[in-house]
A protein has these predicted regions:
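A conserved acidic beta->alpha catalytic loop
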Residues: 92-101, 148
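Short beta-strand-to-loop acidic/aromatic patch adjacent to the donor-nucleotide binding site
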Residues: 138-149
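N-proximal low-complexity "stem/linker" segments adjacent to membrane-targeting elements
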Residues: 2-76
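Residue-level signal for alpha-helix termini/capping positions
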Residues: 78, 82, 104, 134-135, ...
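Short beta-strand/loop segment that forms part of the nucleotide-sugar
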Residues: 61, 85-95, 144
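Acceptor/aglycone-binding surface of glycosyltransferases and processive sugar-polymer synthases
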Residues: 112, 116-135, 152-229
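Short loop->beta transition adjacent to catalytic acidic/histidine clusters or analogous donor-positioning motifs
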Residues: 55-58, 78-89, 110-111
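Donor nucleotide-sugar binding loop of glycosyltransferases
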Residues: 66-69, 95, 122, 151
Length: 229
């Protein structure tokens, strides 16, 4: 089945906006028969906690030594009742600060805690999370960093767009209505005027914030043969 992909963008502190321009038409397969798990490059990981699947969507949170930041993020998500919409799964990159003790996570309705054991950093953590989510049949995945810089209120809107048939949603700090906090000037310049324009030119899609990790993916996108997990 073919899907029209629109590039969605968002304000990370309260309001999500969507670019009205339609992008290229991309065909993603819905059938699970195309999944070839043997080709996935998944780092070794331990499943430290898994309470089972409750929802069709999950929120993946990559974390490493975030201390109070991850606690504050989980508290915000609890107040927003995110766990009523999606299963919350944390992917730990090897924290040593005690911020992810199981006893302290219970109050935040966390469904799973994965610990990456193999090589790699953030991208390796995310691959662990993607593989786990796909193995457990989730139809959509939202990723949000564990540093409490992104606004979890937008998770509800990301999920709504997945339900409407969108395959990829990404937040942006650099569009009208967007806002970034504590982004170094050199980093912002590099993203806005070097990385995003180069990626836009190479891909044929309009990117405004190519490094923002607050995203959502449909299952059919992640299992498509054109996507390398």
């Amino acid at each position: 089945m073919d899907y029209w992909i629109r590039y969605p963008v968002g304000d990370l502190r309260g309001h999500t906006y969507y670019d009205a321009r339609w992008m290229s038409k991309i065909s993603f397969r819905e059938s699970n028969s195309s999944v070839d798990r043997e080709k996935w490059q998944i780092p070794e990981m331990d499943i430290t906690m898994w309470l089972g699947k409750q929802h069709s969507f999950c929120v993946l949170i990559p974390v490493i030594n975030e201390g109070k930041r991850i606690t504050n993020l989980l508290q915000r998500m609890k107040l927003l009742q995110v766990s009523e919409l999606a299963d919350i799964i944390i992917i730990d990159g090897g924290s040593t600060d005690g911020s992810l003790e199981l006893e302290s996570l219970n109050e935040f309705n966390i469904r799973g805690l994965l610990v990456k054991k193999g090589f790699g950093k953030l991208s390796a953590q995310l691959r662990c999370g993607y593989a786990f989510a796909l193995d457990h049949g989730y139809t959509g995945i939202v990723t949000i960093d564990g540093n409490n810089k992104d606004d979890p209120e937008a998770i509800r809107r990301f999920i709504k767009k997945l339900e409407e048939g969108f395959d990829f949603i990404q937040g942006s700090r650099f569009i009208h209505g967007g806002k970034g906090e504590n982004t170094p000037i050199l980093r912002e310049f590099s993203i806005r005027f070097i990385h995003a324009p180069c990626l836009s030119f190479a891909s044929g899609f309009k990117w405004t914030d190519s490094t923002q990790g607050f995203r959502a993916y449909s299952r059919k996108m992640l299992i498509d043969p054109k996507i390398a997990l």
